[in-house]
Amino acid sequence: AGIVVQAYLPDAYEFQTELLDFAKARMADGGAPLKMRLVKGCNLEMETVISSLRGWPNPVRTSKTEVDANYLHILERALLPENAKALHVGVASHNLFTIAYAYLLSRKLGSAEYMTFEMLEGMADHVWRAQSQLGNHVILYAPVVKDEHFLNAVSYLVRRMDENTAPDNFLTHSFNLKPGTDTWRFLQNQFEEAYKMKDVITHIPTRTQNRLHRYTPVPPADVMKNEPDTDFDLAQNQEWVRNIFAKWKKSPADSPEIIPLQIGAETVVCEKRHKYMDRCQDDEVCVCEMSQADAGQVMKILEIAEKDPAGWRKTTLQERHKIMYEAANRLGEMRGDLIGCMLSLIPI
């Protein structure tokens, strides 16, 4: 077992840094070493779909060469003896060039005892058999699924079939592969390009959303575009939501917010009010009191809606478009308070 680091993420190097720091501190405290499984990345389609649905940038690198370069960059640091002792390395790859590089580098650095090769059962079996004959420690793994989750196995199979038949994938070209052929030279050039790039590859993540920053209003546009969801994987957004908790968590000594009733352009605080209690505090703290309309006020609201004194019915489509954008931007500015209000009133 090990903690996976996926090289197709630009910030994978930073994840490795966190693991190294934790593993070294753990060993210094008398604990056992950890293990990092280094993979290229296996959820590209899912990452792409989720990013599209949530309005986020795609988090993965844009080319296979960049992914391979990042893999080699992380691998080199992982195999340094002072790192490999604390954080053992599982080199998960079916690429002969990557495997050979890891094999030679680990022996050059003297860290081979802390490294294993990992391969999927049933894929490139001749490669792991050859490695075993060389005395390498090879771990074979296979997905396991219960009968009731068989659809997950089907989706996994389809994903692997798609991945392993991609034009740039090593396994696509691995059958009857021989040194000196055009296919061999193509794969060799792939590896050499990645090797040249490994020391200049950047580690800047594509997702930099920061809800702590002031909201930037969105100008009107002809095409509707949803506001991106909050990415709670990001540390700054986690801090933002903790601040919301702190702001909206009332104590019994705090006075509740008084919510007025709106009648047309006027607001009225009614004598009759409904109390909303904080569900997260066992309904012991009142968050707000909502004004409740009487029969006369309800009739006045209906009259205003019927007569339309503000002239809403006469506004043009362009005017409504502008107003709706202003309302959307205002909601964006108040996002934190809206979430805080919901957290206070809705049990979680």
Per-region residue spans from a language model:
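Positively charged, amphipathic and often flexible ligand-engagement surfaces
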Residues: A1-D222
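Terminal low-complexity tails and localization/encapsulation signals of metabolic enzymes
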Residues: D147-E303, K307-A310, K314-N329, E333, ...
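Conserved helicase NTPase catalytic core signature
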Residues: L343
